């Protein structure tokens, strides 16, 4: 009986850890520097990605390096990475290659959308509804599906290799991902609070697990 109860408890715990949750109006809060505080997201992926759009909001006053979105596979830790450097530049990595953008800086919550397509390699970064000059990388590449997706830390190993000096301190929310490139009109609609049925990560039906000191709190942006 005790073994049966223990098994049921484990099953319930795992079920709760990755249950779908509507996160509208909420944000993940990372209140202090840590090498073991992060959120792991579970994606719906059935085939290699040849395009993507990732959108999210971040509120932080950090002036150092930090990771906004980290998607790693066992063969490539920077399969997808959105990273802010200490010189106020933002880099997008795909398959270990990266391009750099330098958008405006703001003390307000910032909205980011990054897109990439394999056919041309065209890579875009949108900040608060405004596009940066397009770049190109990893033309013809396909992204692996057996992924570890982490918020709050950069992965220097699959689901690990975290460094305290690259962690996020602040809030992150409205995280959505599609397996195609959204149009400029769609990106601006997402920036304004709309959505287009995200089919990889959906903030309205998010599967996640928090580790360390991370909290779910009401969002601080409209």
Curated annotation (Swiss-Prot):
Top-level lineage group: Eukaryota
Cell location: Secreted
Keyword Ribosomal protein in record: no
Stored Pfam families: Pentaxin
Positions bound to Ca(2+) 1: 78, 154-156
Cysteines joined through disulfide linkages: 55-113
Residues of the Pentraxin (PTX) domain: 24-222
One term under GO cellular component: extracellular space
Induction notes from the record: The concentration of CRP in plasma increases greatly during acute phase response to tissue injury, infection or other inflammatory stimuli.
Residues the record lists as Pyrrolidone carboxylic acid modifications: 20
Signal sequence segment: 1-19
Family: Belongs to the pentraxin family.
Subunit structure, interactors included: Homopentamer. Pentraxin (or pentaxin) have a discoid arrangement of 5 non-covalently bound subunits. Interacts with FCN1; may regulate monocyte activation by FCN1.
Entry function: Displays several functions associated with host defense: it promotes agglutination, bacterial capsular swelling, phagocytosis and complement fixation through its calcium-dependent binding to phosphorylcholine. Can interact with DNA and histones and may scavenge nuclear material released from damaged circulating cells.
Protein name: C-reactive protein
Name of the coding gene: CRP
């Amino acid at each position: 009986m005790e073994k049966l109860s223990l098994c049921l408890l484990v099953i319930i715990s795992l079920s709760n850890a990755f249950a779908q949750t509507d996160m509208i109006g909420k944000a993940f809060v990372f209140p202090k520097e840590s090498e073991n505080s992060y959120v792991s997201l579970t994606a719906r992926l059935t085939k290699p990605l040849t395009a993507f759009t990732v959108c999210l909001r971040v509120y932080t006053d950090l002036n150092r390096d930090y990771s906004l979105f980290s998607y790693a596979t066992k063969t490539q830790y920077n399969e997808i990475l959105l990273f802010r450097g200490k010189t106020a530049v933002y880099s997008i990595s795909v398959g270990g290659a990266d391009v750099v953008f330098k958008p405006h800086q703001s003390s307000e919550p910032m909205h980011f959308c990054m897109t990439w397509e394999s056919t041309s390699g065209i890579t875009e970064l949108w900040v608060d509804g405004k596009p940066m000059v397009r770049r190109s990388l990893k033309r013809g590449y396909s992204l692996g599906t057996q992924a570890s997706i982490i918020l709050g830390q950069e992965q220097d190993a699959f689901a690990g290799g975290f460094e305290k000096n690259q962690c996020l301190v602040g809030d992150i929310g409205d995280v959505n991902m599609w397996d195609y490139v959204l149009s400029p009109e769609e990106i601006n609609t997402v920036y304004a609070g709309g959505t287009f049925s995200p089919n990889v990560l959906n903030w309205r039906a998010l599967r996640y697990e928090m580790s360390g000191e991370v909290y779910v709190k009401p969002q601080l942006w409209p």
